[in-house]
């Protein structure tokens, strides 16, 4: 897609910093390595204050440091509850060391099966939310049945 894979996180960080300028200031300008714009007005502003949450995904060694430095949450992939508990402890320590409130950094685990016990274990390990992915269905009626099955397994 034309991106610089080697520097994807550098570009991502810079784009997020540029967006935060646009989201939080009446007039903003940005001068970076990848993105530059003169003093501009950008409206409408996001409803969420100070800006929409920035959720970073992945499992790279430095992702938790990135989350603490310029994110608001983490979206890990292919993680177990035990590994999540370790990562939550690391994330909390890094946040405290950086002067951030650890509870202000969310963790969302995605793509999980409709397993009430597994979801409870993820919450106990420090996840703020667990996203259950329904099976692909061909019709709306089939999807309704699938969502009811998930609700029965997880919520009721």
Identify the residue ranges that each predicted region occupies.
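Active-site-adjacent structural elements that line small-molecule/cofactor binding pockets in enzymes
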Residues: 1-156
């Amino acid at each position: 897609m034309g991106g610089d894979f080697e520097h994807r996180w550098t570009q991502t960080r810079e784009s997020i910093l540029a967006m935060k300028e646009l989201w939080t200031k009446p007039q903003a300008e940005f001068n970076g390595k990848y993105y530059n714009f003169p003093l501009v007005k950008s409206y409408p502003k996001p409803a969420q204050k100070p800006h929409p949450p920035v959720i970073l995904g992945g499992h790279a060694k430095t992702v938790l440091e990135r989350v603490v430095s310029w994110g608001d949450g983490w979206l890990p992939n292919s993680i177990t509850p035990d590994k999540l508990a370790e990562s939550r402890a690391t994330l909390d320590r890094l946040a405290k060391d950086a002067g951030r409130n650890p509870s202000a950094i969310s963790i969302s685990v995605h793509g999980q099966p409709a397993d009430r016990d597994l979801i409870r274990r993820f919450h106990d390990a420090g996840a703020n939310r667990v996203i259950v992915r329904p099976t692909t269905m061909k019709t709306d009626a089939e999807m309704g049945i699938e969502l009811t099955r998930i609700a029965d397994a997880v919520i009721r």
